[in-house]
């Protein structure tokens, strides 16, 4: 749709490069984001800001017309970056809302409901795509565009409970921070240094990075490879649902 003037290889290549670039920027900025919010106690504010930017960018894709692949990639890349950056702060909230002995339970419940909610919306959107002729859509592309709008609205609705109920802890500043960005870099350096001195933590983080990078690669490129193999859209959707 957006890349109608591109070959399938070009479309896949540009999309993967966009994902790689946004993830690389996250890799560079993530430690600073974490340290910065630790210093000034602004996890909630920045999380909501990042998530709102992502919501807007995903919603804008609904209005992006055919052939506008550059605009689509830009909005997608921005949404991907700020979504992932927001997850850093979202994960930090866990240690603020419960005790250490309940971390695993609360985290597990959160992931379960997250997969259920995401899977439910994906199922609804898949039905819209497969049966667009029976609905109010003029073509299947219109159903896909509408799916981006539903994701944006869905995302916004489930942001509200956290935005309304959660409050950041007040950070007591013992001295005025002349340059909070410099302080965040210092804190990041201190954290990296402490990790490098602890072999077990270092190996765990390295293993997790390689594992999760593989998972994200499969998630982001599975549909592309399936399309290159000329698999039917219905078969791809069923495979993703399973």
Where are the regions that the model predicts?
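Central cavity-lining transmembrane alpha-helices of secondary-active solute carriers
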Residues: 12-35, 122, 242
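C-terminal membrane-cytosol helix-exit motif in multi-pass small-molecule transporters
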Residues: 121-134, 152-172
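Short amphipathic helix-loop junctions that connect adjacent transmembrane helices
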Residues: 1-12, 220-238
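Hydrophobic core of transmembrane alpha-helices in multi-pass small-molecule transporters
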Residues: 57-60, 67-86, 210
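Pair of pore-lining "gating" transmembrane helices in MFS-fold secondary transporters
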Residues: 1-4, 77, 193-218
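Juxtamembrane intracellular "pre-TM" segments in multi-pass secondary transporters
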Residues: 167-206, 228
């Amino acid at each position: 749709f957006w890349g109608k003037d591109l070959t399938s290889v070009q479309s896949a290549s540009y999309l993967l490069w966009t994902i790689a670039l946004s993830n690389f920027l996250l890799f560079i900025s993530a430690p600073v984001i974490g340290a910065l919010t630790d210093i000034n106690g602004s996890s909630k504010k920045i999380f909501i800001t990042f998530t709102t930017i992502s919501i807007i960018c995903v919603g804008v894709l609904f209005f992006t017309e055919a052939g506008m692949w550059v605009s689509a990639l830009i909005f997608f890349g921005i949404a991907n970056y700020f979504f992932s950056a927001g997850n850093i702060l979202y994960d930090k909230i866990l240690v603020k809302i419960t005790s250490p002995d309940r971390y695993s339970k609360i985290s597990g419940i959160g992931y379960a409901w997250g997969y259920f909610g995401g899977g439910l919306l994906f199922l609804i959107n898949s039905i819209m795509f497969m049966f667009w002729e029976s609905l109010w859509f003029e073509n299947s592309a219109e159903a896909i565009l509408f799916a981006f709008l539903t994701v944006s609205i869905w995302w916004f609705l489930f942001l509200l409970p956290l935005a309304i109920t959660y409050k950041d802890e007040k950070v007591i500043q013992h001295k005025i921070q002349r340059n909070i960005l410099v302080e965040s870099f210092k804190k990041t350096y201190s954290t990296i240094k402490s990790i490098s001195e602890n072999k077990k933590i270092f190996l765990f983080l390295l293993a997790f990075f390689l594992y999760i990078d593989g998972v994200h690669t499969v998630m982001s490129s599975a549909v592309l490879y399936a399309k290159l193999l000329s698999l039917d859209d219905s078969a791809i959707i069923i495979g993703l649902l399973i």
